[in-house]
């Protein structure tokens, strides 16, 4: 199964794809979609188009997206939520199911504790996928999200327990 992980952001949205065969995970691709400058609708359109392009290129079977945390600045949280929405819409418009995980769940599944630093996540992603170098922070977070989904860890499994599929999305 090919899993697309997404770390949403308005300026940079990280993506990471892994292939799961039984217990084995293999790296497929990772990177970022840059929205650049301009109006909010234009930037969201770039993110939507970029994720669509990733999906068309790599043909994932499912998608895992990091849940937005509530920031100190409410405006930043709203903007991040809109970027996340654009990414989810791209996945759903391509008939992918979307699982959602908190940063705590992702760090717990990949590093072993929920308060891990970004560098720890990068290093564990590098090790788990046998990469020669650690991916960038945004790509590593996206790959970690995909790894969390692949592991179906106890924390990850709880995030979808009791939900049903509606329009390609867990509700």
Curated annotation (Swiss-Prot):
Mg(2+) 1 binds at residues 7, 138. It is found in: Cytoplasm. It catalyses: Endonucleolytic cleavage at a junction such as a reciprocal single-stranded crossover between two homologous DNA duplexes (Holliday junction). The active site is at residues 7, 66, 138. PROSITE patterns: RUVC (PS01321). InterPro entries: RNaseH-like_sf, RNaseH_sf, X-over_junc_endoDNase_Mg_BS, X-over_junc_endoDNase_RuvC. Its EC number is 3.1.21.10. The RuvA-RuvB-RuvC complex processes Holliday junction (HJ) DNA during genetic recombination and DNA repair. Endonuclease that resolves HJ intermediates. Cleaves cruciform DNA by making single-stranded nicks across the HJ at symmetrical positions within the homologous arms, yielding a 5'-phosphate and a 3'-hydroxyl group; requires a central core of homology in the junction. The consensus cleavage sequence is 5'-(A/T)TT(C/G)-3'. Cleavage occurs on the 3'-side of the TT dinucleotide at the point of strand exchange. Belongs to the RuvC family. This is Crossover junction endodeoxyribonuclease RuvC. It comes from Thiobacillus denitrificans (strain ATCC 25259 / T1).
């Amino acid at each position: 199964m090919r899993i697309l992980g997404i770390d949403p952001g308005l300026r940079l949205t990280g993506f990471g794809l892994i292939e799961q065969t039984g217990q084995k995970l293999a790296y497929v691709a990772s990177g970022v979609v840059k929205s650049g400058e301009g109006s909010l609708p234009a930037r969201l359109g770039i993110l939507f188009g970029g994720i669509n392009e990733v999906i068309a290129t790599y043909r994932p079977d499912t998608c895992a997206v990091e849940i937005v945390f509530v920031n100190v600045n409410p405006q930043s949280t709203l903007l991040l939520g809109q970027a996340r929405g654009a990414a989810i819409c791209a996945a759903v418009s391509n008939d992918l199911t979307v699982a959602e995980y908190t940063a705590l769940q992702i760090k717990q599944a990949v590093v072993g504790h929920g308060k891990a630093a970004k560098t720890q996540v990068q290093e564990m992603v590098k090790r788990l996928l046998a990469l020669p170098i650690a991916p960038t922070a945004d790509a590593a977070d996206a790959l970690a999200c995909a790894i969390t989904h692949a592991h179906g860890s106890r924390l990850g499994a709880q995030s979808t327990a009791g939900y049903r599929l509606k329009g390609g999305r867990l509700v």
